[in-house]
Amino acid sequence: MSTVPPAHKITFLRHGESVGNAENRFQGHADFPLTDRGRDQATALAERWKSEGLVFDFAIASPLLRARETAEIIAAALDLPLEFDPLWKELDNGLMAGLNQEEAAQRVPRPDFMTPYTRFGQTGESRWEMFLRAGQRVQNLLDRPPGRYLVVSHGGILNMAMYCTLSITPQADFAGPRFSFGNTGFARMRYEHATHNWRLTFFDNGF
């Protein structure tokens, strides 16, 4: 009798619309809650997945409010165990956190050229540091038993998680691909242990 080789099936999900999104602010570690629209987005996605018969074994989320609330809504609807991991927080964008575009341009002007090692907002992380952090969290998932995992997080760190799985490295001045995770956008990844290969099996850019 044939057996299915073990695999990790991982869904990377960005949070619903936050107050920071609605006000067009740089969020980073600034802790904005969901808007009513964001809560509706999370509820609608949970209902969609439930109707599709989609099953997860475990959920992991950033503890920042916008991700926490999204994860709690979905975990409650799908009866999922949920843990919070601070290493799944968004990019630390330093002095830019919470500022709108105009405020950031005045207080923390962007350098003319950014290497992968340039810190955001003068005191924050670089994209390279975020890439390494994402790689550690992806490895943490693979260190767990094969199964179906949901990760609820943020657009920046999820892009770096995708980079890690697809063998892409950050480039200077944001060259390279960008995965457009809209609010409640998600990517489904599969890691085959027999071949040590990752596959992107589905992408939905959300709202």
Predicted regions mapped to residue ranges:
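Short beta-strand scaffold positions
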Residues: 61-62, 132, 152-153
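Domain-level recognition of soluble alpha/beta enzyme cores
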Residues: 169-197
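Phosphate-handling substructures
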Residues: 76-136, 190
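Generic beta-sheet signal
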Residues: 10, 147-156
